[in-house]
Design a protein with these regions (language model features):
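N-terminal active-site segment of His-dependent metallophosphoesterases
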Residues: 1-44, 115-123, 221-226
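Active-site regions of enzymes building and remodeling cell-envelope glycoconjugates
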Residues: 27-29, 48-53, 66-76, 177, ...
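Conserved catalytic scaffold of divalent metal-dependent phosphoesterases
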Residues: 5-14, 59-149
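Short, conserved loop/helix-junction motifs that constitute active-site signature segments
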Residues: 23-24, 44-48, 153-157, 180-182
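Binuclear metal-dependent phosphoesterase catalytic core
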Residues: 6, 15, 64, 77-81, ...
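Active-site environment of divalent metal-dependent phosphoester hydrolases
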Residues: 10-14, 35-41, 57-63, 93-97, ...
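Active-site neighborhood of phospho(di)ester-bond hydrolases with catalytic His/Asp-centered motifs
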Residues: 5-7, 28-34, 52-57, 73, ...
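A short, gly/pro- and small-residue-rich
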Residues: 47-58, 147-150
Length: 227
């Protein structure tokens, strides 16, 4: 399965003819946040692939104007094309009273509240996050620190891959690194865009099928569900 992952910076080349070919080649499109609703909605016009998104720390407008035709994975495990995708958007809290920012303790509580959902799903295959892991591709300033609680989450559930954004290439002073690893699991900064192919060893057969617990606002295909 060929996955196009997006984050933070709209990619100009995706608006042209080359971009249309890139979109058509994708089996699945994932957004790690901080992208305009119109940008994600545009993608759905040129691809039959599902577009799955979470919130970045600047995406407070998604509540009133969500991306049309896209699957919202924020705070849930969603089953799309046999992949169990866990969505944990937002950044570390560096301003008060912003609903897309969380303290370390708040993010840890979010994960704890998902335990029952994770059990029903039998785990997850992809962690779709906005922020990185603490100490792994994050930065020293408060606004761009990662979350420590992502480490035990990955080690316990052993997903295929984690995608995130938030740390822009322009912020990294020539030290930008897209692909890192935590406990043997690839951790990829998808800022701008990144194309990823699932390993041949992955199989959707382990993903359980269950009825959606609530209706998804999406152009969902059969089998695309909330757990």
């Amino acid at each position: 399965m060929h996955i196009l992952v997006l984050a933070d910076d709209p990619v100009q080349r995706l608006w042209g003819e080359y971009g249309k070919e890139t979109l058509k080649a994708a089996d699945l499109i994932l957004s790690c946040g901080d992208l305009p609703s119109s940008y994600l909605s545009y993608m759905t016009c040129f691809t039959s692939a599902p577009v799955v998104y979470i919130h970045g720390n600047h995406d407070t407008g998604y509540e009133t104007r969500p991306p049309e035709g896209c699957v919202n994975a924020e705070g849930h495990v969603v089953l799309v094309k046999g992949l169990r995708i866990l969505g944990l958007g937002g950044s570390i809290r560096y301003r008060p009273d912003v609903p897309t920012m969380f303290s370390e303790e708040e993010m840890a509580r979010r994960i704890q509240k998902l335990r029952r959902e994770l059990k029903r799903a039998g785990g997850f295959d992809i962690l779709l996050a906005h922020s990185p892991i603490a100490g792994l591709g994050d930065q020293e300033d408060l606004a761009h620190r990662g979350f420590e609680c992502f480490k035990p989450l990955l080690s316990e559930y052993r997903p295929v891959v984690m995608f995130h954004g938030h740390v822009h290439q322009a912020y990294s002073a020539g030290k930008f690194q897209r692909v890192r690893e935590w406990d043997g699991i690839p951790v990829i900064n998808a800022c701008g865009s990144y194309e990823y192919d699932l390993p041949d060893t992955w199989s959707p057969s382990g993903a359980p099928t269950c009825f959606a617990r609530r209706k998804m606002k999406s152009r969902a295909e059969p089998g695309d569900e909330h757990f």
